[in-house]
Amino acid sequence: MGNPKGFIEIEKKLGGYRPVSERIGDFGEVEQTLDEQDRISQASRCMDCGVPFCHWACPVGSNIPEWQDAVYRGKWDEAYSILTKTNSFPEFTGRICPAPCEKSCVLAIHDESVTIRENECAVVEHAFDLNLVHPNIPKFRTGKKIAVVGSGPAGLSVADLLNQAGHTVTVFEQDNEVGGLLRYGIPDFKLNKGIIDRRIELFVKEGVLFKPNTKVGEHISEQQLMDDFDAVCLACGAMEPRDLKSTPGRELKGIHFAMDFLKQQNKVVKGERIPESIHIHAKNKKVLVIGGGDTGSDCVGTSIRQRATSVTQIEILDKPSDQRMEDNPWPFWPNTIRTSSSHLEGCERRWSLNTRRFIGENGSLKAVEVVKVEWTKTNGQMTMREIPGTEEIIQADLVMLSLGFLSPVHEGLLDRLKVDYDARGNVKANDFATNVDKVFVAGDATRGASLVVHAIRSGRDAALKMHEFVMR
């Protein structure tokens, strides 16, 4: 620790966002950054704790105090080396991770935490700017062939580590571009897709083979996959969306899954044309986002940029507190209210509302009936009841269902492979190995829908088990 009084003398400083009036006019990244000296000053606030709980809270186990100290000393190459020992893609997590590390920072007990996520992003961007990032081409090949199905963060992590181990890795992606959730599920205003392209270009130079527009079971059979490869990793995500199937009016035109909406917009930003007959667009629409999570927030920001007339986001749960509750102490993740850059751009947020029915006219959505709910805890279980007389009509002609995901899609590849599922419908695994010989699983497909950083960790761990398997 170069400055033992840094956390006392220096206040936390963030890069902040571009002005609202500017950023809602495009899909460029909304976050700004600090200059190099400010980054060094922020790194000096890291206290060299006896027990660094930031490291404990980070899903990939990032050695945060070590690389923060390197930043403080201006050793960007050293900081990048430390950072990438545990994280394959700090340029992704440095932009979109909710930073559980900062919530568990020791300084956060009584003050603002050390700046970690933004400094992480600064480290990797400095590394690219200073030409410190080069293709790490394996010095030998083992002769083993690995197939990875899915090119999201888990699949890319698997491919990275197994390629570096000398295996020949082929990644199959059903969409026309590589990246999975990173590419199609996260708006450009949070993650510019050029950042993904930059990493994929490195992978290609390192020898990873990518097969976009290739759906296993259609363009290549499961049997061919099993015959041609020594091991297969299923990294297909958890893409079965939670629906409101039993809600009256669900069939009306104008009700869409959030991911369909976001995926289309990401394609439009890339320059693809969406046929008018299937194009989901919020221009001049009263938009209602059902679901209060990050994906819902992304729908809010996207709708605002598409010039929606109004945007409302509702959540069935109660409004979180501004502060930690007694049963939610540090260093655990705080169950407090979170406000995203999209929320700051102009939307109405409401809580404790359940969707009763969708109201239409001539087959098209016109409004949504909601009702207030009350949550109580009984025998440790939260239960909900509707409050009579609190019914309300919200005008809406475009609804985004952002209710999370149930599991990976079973129909098709997974069912044909005859993998086992757990009680939640995720692919059942023992040390990432499925019940099917030489078939492994990583990421959301086995864990359930979660954070990108968890998918990265899962992919890295799965890669180690796969390496052990093929080298027996």
Regions of interest found by a model, annotated:
Residues 3-43, 91, 110-144, 253-264, ...:
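Extreme N-terminal leader/targeting segments of oxidoreductases
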Residues 5-32, 61-73, 78-87, 109, ...:
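Beta1-alpha1 glycine-rich phosphate/pyrophosphate-binding loop at the start
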Residues 44-66, 88-110:
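Local cysteine-cluster metal-coordination motifs and their immediate loop/turn environment
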Residues 78, 140, 145-149, 197-246, ...:
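Feature captures the FAD/FMN-dependent oxidoreductase FAD-binding
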Residues 123-140, 198-218, 241-306, 421-435:
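Glycine-rich dinucleotide-binding loop and its adjacent helix/turn
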Residues 253-284, 364, 376-449:
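FAD-site-proximal beta/loop scaffold in flavoenzymes
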Residues 280-320, 358, 382-398, 405-406, ...:
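Long hydrophobic segments that form regular secondary structure
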Residues 296-299, 445-471:
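A conserved FAD-binding loop/helix module that cradles the flavin
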